[in-house]
């Protein structure tokens, strides 16, 4: 909460990934720095995960985030992609800290069906990122 009070125009997230680029082009999701914890501050290159403690001030986000038909059509399995690129389009920065563990905890044998299979291992996040960027007319 302290981080949010000190940065009211930012999205505050405990768990983030750092997006990486090659020659100015966004690298595939698998090539990003995941569960990034070497940064304390805000950046436009931090990609918040929508779990693990994320505060998104509704007043700073575009109303288009509520366009459920488009969301369901182009990135139904990646709400974090939808929210992150909507925020990036509006130039909203993400702030994080470096003093909490960024790795999620899962209970053995409860994650047989999981989004990581579809979104990370099979490249679903990259497809959904491209679809959202195309929809938002994002470079």
Model-derived regions: residue spans:
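Conserved catalytic core of nucleotide-sugar-dependent glycosyltransferases
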Residues: 1-69
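C-terminal catalytic/acceptor-binding lobe
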Residues: 59, 63, 68-139
């Amino acid at each position: 909460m302290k981080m949010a009070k000190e940065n009211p125009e930012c999205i505050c997230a405990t768990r983030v990934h750092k997006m990486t680029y090659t020659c100015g082009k966004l690298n595939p999701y698998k090539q990003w720095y995941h569960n990034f914890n070497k940064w304390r501050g805000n950046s436009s290159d931090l990609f918040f995960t929508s779990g693990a403690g994320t505060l998104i001030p509704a007043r700073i986000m575009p109303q288009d985030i509520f366009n459920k038909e488009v969301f369901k059509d182009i990135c139904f399995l990646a709400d974090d992609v939808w929210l992150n690129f909507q925020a990036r389009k509006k130039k909203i920065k993400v702030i994080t800290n470096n003093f909490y563990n960024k790795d999620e905890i899962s209970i053995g044998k409860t994650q047989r069906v999981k989004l990581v299979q579809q979104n990370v291992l099979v490249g679903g996040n990259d497809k959904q990122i491209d679809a959202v960027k195309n929809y938002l007319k994002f470079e």
